[in-house]
Swiss-Prot record:
Keyword Signal found: yes
Keyword Nucleus listed: no
Residue stretches spanning the membrane: none
A GO term from the CC aspect: extracellular region
Protein name: Conotoxin Lt11.1
Source organism per UniProt: Conus litteratus (Lettered cone)
Subcellular location: Secreted
Lineage of source species: Eukaryota, Metazoa, Spiralia, Lophotrochozoa, Mollusca
Amino acid sequence: MMFRLTSVLLVIVLLNLVVLTNACHMDCSKMICCSGICCFYCGLPSCDDTRRALLQRLLGHQR
């Protein structure tokens, strides 16, 4: 019983991660990212730092 419960929870967590990752990839393609976890995932600043995000993107493309 305990094993089944654990595996169900594990599957739920994994599914959430997949969904989140896909959503974050969509967020990453924008210049700024507005959802905190996605910002962390993408290494992007949140919406308050729009100008800095744009600069980082531009500098990143030049490398």
